[in-house]
């Protein structure tokens, strides 16, 4: 076991994490040169295109060090984005060490720091590495100072490398072997294995990626998953080098995969503990928690007959993404669709993009909402994730909304505009620190303000230099109201929005004005109203199209004209009683665009 090193790589987006992983695999001969391709470990097209890692992957490599010994290196590639922070913490808890990759030309950024703190809390040894030193703009001294200043670990002997050219990659591996401790664990103890990730394979069912903490596992053993208590016979075990290779046994300290004929991905939860069915471990490994969706949105097919296809596509996505939740939902305006729960905005975009791309769906998405905790006047508490399900104002005692702690990092030139943005979003400042030219701001902001467009606006006010990460803090009482849109006195459920009272009039007016432009003129007047409960806060009128009934009157008495006008008015009144207004699909999309401003 002294020759095993389990490590992962922590980095902000675009600091070269996947490229460094590619180089390490190449140096260790994990893949022949002809099989090498960019971003070997990012298997989804969308991961490659956006340059992000979504699912954790592993590679078991062997490396002959300069001291002549052969070491087994297990690289666990982690997602870097804040939406997947739980998966990151599981990947990190399976390691003893982490390479902290920092772009020498850009210094420390938000997600680096967030994941690095997670690593330090889990007791993982952090090894700093400066990447991209071949760039003309590289400033290693500055980057080292930032690492020491912001994260507070000693980086004076940080290894310098360039993952693109392969320069210094062996030095990185040597530093890794020297600084990272070998795994602890007892191969003879009862089996405890941590599920780092799991995915669905069409041929063998669920594949679980595990780190064996104690004990030994062999094929044909019967295993038990401790969160659910379900039992399965093991069919295959092995390691990825990044290609899969079957083995006869996996023992303490190793990272590998288990295939046990599990049909449902929800059975193999990330962070759960695997043990033997007969000789079970006394207790599971710490840190397991159920992942709860934070952001909800309705997904509706543009064509009503695509509903079944959408359901099948969601089922298939769910096979590979246990954190996606969905349930059927009916809207009078948009027909049949699904209410889906996501971990965060990036997760939502990825699911939408995969539905559109891999399954060829045309979708309408309603505005993203968060989950509110509503205390009703009879004392019961309900969780509301859909504006249409919000009780009437008279039955509500108090509404609590989720608050998140946001950490922002930016060059000091942009502090002013970022603070202004946070204040507009009802944020309250907790902390502000200067690290050289970088500034770290900590704010508490309602989650609802973040899901709309916070990230895009942050990037635009800081010209792309600011980076952020957020984590859920608590539910806090807040004065939020539900704004309904009425057309000729009828509520349109899909257009309801939940906003803070201070913004309700402005938002109501804006949506009404937008709808006035979009709904075509009818043969009678159409009133568009925004209301909170029974209280109307905004109104727009669409004037009727009318025929000129006086065209045939030349001169003559005024009473004749009056009679014709009265008759027309009567007719319009009758039409208004029976007519219903068709709301075009664009109206819904327009509402979403109002929210993007």
Swiss-Prot record:
Cite the GO molecular-function annotations of the record: GTP binding; GTPase activity; guanosine tetraphosphate binding; ribosome binding; translation elongation factor activity
EC numbers: 3.6.5.n1
Q: What Gene Ontology terms for biological process does this UniProt record contain? A: positive regulation of translation
Query: How does the protein's chain sit in the membrane according to the entry?
Result: Peripheral membrane protein
Output the Gene Ontology cellular-component terms.
Answer: plasma membrane
User: What are the residue boundaries of the tr-type G domain, all occurrences included?
Assistant: 2-184
Q: Which InterPro entries match?
A: EF-4 (IPR006297), EFG_III/V (IPR035647), EFG_V-like (IPR000640), EFTu-like_2 (IPR004161), G_TR_CS (IPR031157), LepA_C_sf (IPR038363), LepA_CTD (IPR013842), LepA_IV (IPR035654)
Subcellular location as annotated? Cell inner membrane
What reaction does this enzyme carry out catalytically?
GTP + H2O = GDP + phosphate + H(+)
NCBIfam families linked: lepA, small_GTP
Describe the task this protein carries out: Required for accurate and efficient protein synthesis under certain stress conditions. May act as a fidelity factor of the translation reaction, by catalyzing a one-codon backward translocation of tRNAs on improperly translocated ribosomes. Back-translocation proceeds from a post-translocation (POST) complex to a pre-translocation (PRE) complex, thus giving elongation factor G a second chance to translocate the tRNAs correctly. Binds to ribosomes in a GTP-dependent manner.
Protein name per the record? Elongation factor 4
| Native species | Burkholderia multivorans (strain ATCC 17616 / 249)
């Amino acid at each position: 076991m002294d020759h095993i090193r389990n490590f992962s790589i922590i980095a902000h987006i675009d600091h070269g994490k996947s490229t460094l992983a590619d180089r390490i695999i190449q140096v260790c001969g994990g893949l022949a040169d002809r099989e090498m391709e960019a971003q070997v470990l990012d298997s989804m097209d969308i991961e490659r295109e956006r340059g992000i890692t979504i699912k954790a992957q592993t590679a078991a490599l062997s490396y002959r060090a300069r001291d002549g010994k052969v070491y087994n290196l297990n690289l666990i590639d982690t997602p870097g984005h804040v939406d997947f922070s739980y998966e990151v913490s599981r990947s990190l808890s399976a390691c003893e060490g982490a390479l902290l990759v920092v772009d020498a030309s850009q210094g420390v950024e938000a997600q680096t720091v967030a994941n690095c703190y997670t690593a330090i809390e889990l007791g993982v040894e952090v090894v700093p590495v400066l990447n991209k030193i071949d760039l003309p703009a590289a400033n290693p001294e500055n980057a080292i100072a930032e690492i020491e200043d912001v994260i507070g670990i000693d980086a004076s002997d940080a290894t310098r490398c360039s993952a693109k050219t392969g320069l210094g990659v062996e030095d990185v591996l040597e530093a890794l072997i020297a600084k990272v401790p070998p795994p602890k664990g007892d191969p003879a103890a009862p089996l405890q294995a941590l599920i780092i990730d799991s995915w669905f394979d069409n041929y063998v069912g669920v594949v679980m990626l595990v780190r064996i903490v104690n004990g030994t596992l062999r094929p044909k053993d019967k295993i038990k998953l401790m969160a659910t208590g379900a039992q399965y016979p093991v069919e295959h075990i092995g390691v990825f080098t990044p290609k899969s290779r079957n083995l006869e046994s996996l023992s303490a300290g190793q990272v590998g995969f288990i295939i046990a004929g599990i049909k449902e991905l929800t059975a193999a939860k990330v962070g759960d503990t695997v043990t033997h069915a007969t000789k079970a471990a006394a207790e599971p490994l710490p840190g397991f928690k159920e992942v709860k969706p934070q952001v909800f949105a309705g997904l509706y097919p543009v064509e009503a007959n695509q509903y079944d296809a959408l359901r099948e596509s969601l089922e298939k996505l769910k096979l590979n993404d246990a954190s996606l939740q969905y349930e059927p939902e009916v809207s009078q305006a948009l027909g049949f669709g699904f209410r889906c729960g996501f971990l965060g905005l990036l997760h939502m975009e990825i699911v939408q993009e995969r539905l559109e791309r891999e399954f060829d769906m045309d979708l309408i998405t309603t505005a993203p909402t968060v989950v509110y905790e509503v205390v009703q006047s009879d004392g019961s508490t309900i969780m509301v994730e859909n504006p249409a399900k919000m009780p009437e104002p008279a039955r509500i005692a108090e509404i609590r909304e989720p608050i998140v702690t946001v950490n922002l990092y930016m060059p000091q030139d942009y502090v002013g505009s970022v603070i202004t943005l946070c204040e507009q979003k009802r944020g309250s400042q907790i902390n502000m620190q200067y690290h050289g030219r970088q500034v770290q701001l900590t704010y508490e902001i309602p989650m609802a303000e973040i899901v709309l467009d916070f990230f895009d606006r942050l990037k635009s006010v800081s010209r792309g230099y600011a980076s952020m990460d957020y984590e859920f803090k608590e539910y806090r009482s807040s004065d939020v109201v539900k704004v309904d849109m009425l057309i000729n006195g009828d509520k349109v459920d899909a257009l309801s929005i939940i906003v803070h009272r201070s913004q309700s009039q402005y938002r109501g007016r804006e949506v009404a004005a937008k709808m006035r432009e979009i709904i075509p003129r009818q043969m009678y007047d159409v009133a568009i109203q925004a209301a909170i409960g029974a209280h109307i806060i905004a109104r727009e009128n669409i004037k009727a199209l009318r025929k000129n009934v006086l065209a045939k009157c030349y001169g003559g008495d005024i009473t004749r004209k009056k009679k014709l006008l009265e008759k027309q008015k009567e007719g319009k009144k009758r039409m208004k009683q029976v007519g219903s207004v068709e709301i075009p699909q664009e109206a819904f999309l327009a509402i979403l665009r109002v929210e993007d401003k």
